[in-house]
């Protein structure tokens, strides 16, 4: 139905059975400054029309995921800068990702359609291999979260990199669209705090709190794998303060990044073990 609504947006009502369309459709009066800044008017209308229709369906969480993916892709930002755009793009620009002149994105419909079919495909593929195993997701501050009924053989994690990304801001479209609680003031190592000595020390202190907390539920000799960009060499002290031994450190270049720039980026994987 979003396709029909989109056609209604693009053509005068009298050309498309005016009685029918006037009865069922209306433009959304969106005053949200974030959407007005980062999205074209057509995209805004399509996104909020789809959101309005979600409540009529059973699998609402799946539809919200589809819409969230579509909203991320429909922002008026350069194709090569999906993670940290500085400002919206309102005119044609040279795209280093596609190596040609690209235009600002005007619609959300094509992304809604693309991700709908992609999601169906993924669900069908997963259904063929899924087992009776269960997964429990606990949302909380890892410095404080309590996991009293559990014990773990190990951890595999990739914490935020100090001063690199404002993760809440990167996904602001979802916070604004679904009215999620914003806990950006709790974010560890955000770009907004920079990479000063004070910021690095605060980051290190926060990560020590994280691993000391979760260590309470780790079995003896538990294995910990941490994917990091540790150019400041912060993790040896983190391991020491948490009573973890460093078993090995693996290094690798990162070749397929979200940002299509020329910045050389590498990561390390720390293999630690609880003493």
In which residue ranges do the predicted regions lie?
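Class I S-adenosyl-L-methionine
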Residues: 229-275
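Short amphipathic alpha-helical segments
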Residues: 52, 167-170, 237-239
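Conserved phosphoryl-transfer catalytic core
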Residues: 1-53, 180-193
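Mobile active-site "lid"/loop adjacent to the S-adenosyl-L-methionine
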Residues: 35, 160-206
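Internal hydrophobic scaffold segments of catalytic domains
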Residues: 1-7, 151-174
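Acceptor-substrate binding/catalytic loop of class I
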Residues: 30-42, 197-203, 224-230
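SAM-dependent nucleic-acid methyltransferase catalytic core
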Residues: 40-156, 162-165
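A short glycine-rich, Lys/Arg-flanked "PGG" loop and its adjoining helix->strand segment in the class I
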Residues: 204-220, 239
């Amino acid at each position: 139905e979003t396709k029909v609504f989109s056609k209604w947006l693009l053509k005068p009502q009298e050309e498309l059975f005016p009685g029918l369309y006037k009865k069922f459709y209306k433009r959304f009066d969106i005053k949200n400054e974030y959407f007005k800044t980062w999205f074209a008017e057509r995209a805004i209308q399509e996104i909020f029309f789809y959101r309005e229709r979600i409540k009529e369906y059973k699998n609402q969480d799946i539809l919200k995921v589809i819409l969230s993916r579509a909203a991320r892709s429909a922002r008026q930002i350069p194709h090569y800068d999906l993670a940290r755009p500085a400002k919206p793009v309102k005119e044609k620009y040279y795209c280093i990702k596609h190596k040609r002149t690209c235009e600002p994105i005007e619609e959300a419909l094509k992304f809604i359609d693309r991700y709908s079919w992609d999601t169906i495909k993924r669900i069908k593929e997963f259904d063929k291999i899924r087992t009776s195993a269960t997964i429990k997701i606990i949302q909380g501050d890892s410095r404080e979260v309590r996991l009293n009924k559990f014990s773990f053989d190990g951890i595999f994690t990739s914490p935020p990199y100090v001063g690199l990304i404002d993760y809440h801001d990167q996904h602001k479209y979802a916070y604004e669209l679904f009215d999620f609680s914003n806990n950006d003031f709790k974010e560890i190592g955000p770009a907004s705090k920079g990479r000063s000595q004070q910021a690095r020390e605060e980051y290190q202190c926060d990560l020590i709190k994280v691993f000391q907390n979760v260590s309470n539920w780790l079995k003896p000799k538990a294995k910990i794998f941490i994917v990091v960009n540790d150019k400041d060499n912060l993790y040896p002290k983190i391991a020491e303060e948490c009573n973890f031994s460093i078993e090995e450190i693996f290094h690798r270049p990162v070749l397929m990044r979200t940002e299509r720039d020329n910045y050389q980026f590498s990561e390390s994987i720390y293999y630690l073990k609880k003493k």
